[in-house]
Amino acid sequence: MTAEKITQGTEGLNVPNEPIIPFIIGDGIGPDIWKAASRVIDAAVEKAYNGEKRIEWKEVLAGQKAFDTTGEWLPQETLDTIKEYLIAVKGPLTTPIGGGIRSLNVALRQELDLFTCLRPVRWFKGVPSPVKRPQDVDMVIFRENTEDIYAGIEFKEGTTEVKKVIDFLQNEMGATNIRFPETSGIGIKPVSKEGTERLVRAAIQYAIDNNRKSVTLVHKGNIMKFTEGSFKQWGYDLALTEFGDQVFTWQQYDEIVEKEGRDAANVAQEKAEKEGKIIIKDSIADIFLQQILTRPAEHDVVATMNLNGDYISDALAAQVGGIGIAPGANINYETGHAIFEATHGTAPKYAGLNKVNPSSVILSSVLMLEHLGWQEAADKITDSIEDTIASKVVTYDFARLMDGAEEVSTSAFADELIKNLK
């Protein structure tokens, strides 16, 4: 068997039996969790395919290790390698302290145009949770990754640049509601039709491919009408234009209410649901954040902008056990580029202690296996995590909250997962 690159074809990824996949080990606890995760992934692939498939791991540098080795936090060679090999896995990265150096995670997303942050959130039986019914949470978040106020277009208070921006806004654009112009910093919030459409397209296609029931467009369009409000409208428009016979939208529902009454609209939606159509709906962000606590079962796939998605993803993760067990991926569904990553930080005080929970990067690797079409290996890991947590053999973060738990190290937890692969 010869290791080969994954390539992008007209119908999606072309995945060889021995793909070369770059990995970034990560800072802080990165080496601990990656060592555990890679053993679990390799064991699951071996068990699923009896040696007919395997992954050839290729280390690339980013973060502290890259800086110590090359003097750069994110070497161009790393970006070029990921561009060439399409798929990568990464541990948590330190954001360098100091002005002018952006988050390495954000830099990777922007340089590779990874426009979707994919965050599936579900509960594993036995995981400690602060809510009464964590089992009702089963959502997949599609967070737009390249626009919104996270685009990094900011001007610091007191600088020549911000004075120019404020002067332009006040004198050229007639903006009279900058309350304290002399002491304000300014941030720009770009939201485009193209950026919205490619995100919503990916979310709806995911819902169709995975037999989900609905896609909720989450926004603050009631306040920010030409950015978040446009996101909502562009999302609805795309749903009907590109997926017309496969979806039923709340805007269609409202039109039926206006013409034929609410009873007729309810009948139309029930008919669409029975036919397996995806219901496209929307929710204002603050109401949505209430509903994920009070009635989470009403939401399935979620498409939202960058800032909303950041809040929502971590708020949902807290309901099912925290970011230690939350997977994440950053994907460009058009070019095939994707990075699968731990969603938590570097936790430097635990570095090298062989103590922390490796589940986030393991479950992110499950997403990677699913993305590659290696569902059998992915399912084996998911089932093993379920069985292992149910048996109460867990790392310290869960053990301290579970009665009768056996606390084990990072490496011992990986051993248990490998033992429970079926």
Curated annotation (Swiss-Prot):
Xref: PROSITE patterns: IDH_IMDH
Positions annotated to bind Mg(2+): D310
Keyword presence, NADP: yes
Annotated positions for site Critical for catalysis: Y150, K220
Protein name listed in UniProt: Isocitrate dehydrogenase [NADP]
Gene name for this UniProt entry: icd
SMART domains per the UniProt record, alphabetical: Iso_dh
InterPro entries: IsoCit/isopropylmalate_DH_CS (IPR019818), Isocitrate_DH_NADP_dimer_prok (IPR004439), IsoPropMal-DH-like_dom (IPR024084)
Source species: Staphylococcus aureus (strain MRSA252)
GO terms (BP aspect): glyoxylate cycle; tricarboxylic acid cycle
Record keywords, A-Z: Glyoxylate bypass, Magnesium, Manganese, Metal-binding, NADP, Oxidoreductase, Tricarboxylic acid cycle
Catalytic reactions on record: D-threo-isocitrate + NADP(+) = 2-oxoglutarate + CO2 + NADPH
Residues binding D-threo-isocitrate: S103, N105, R109, R119, R143
Record-stated family: Belongs to the isocitrate and isopropylmalate dehydrogenases family.
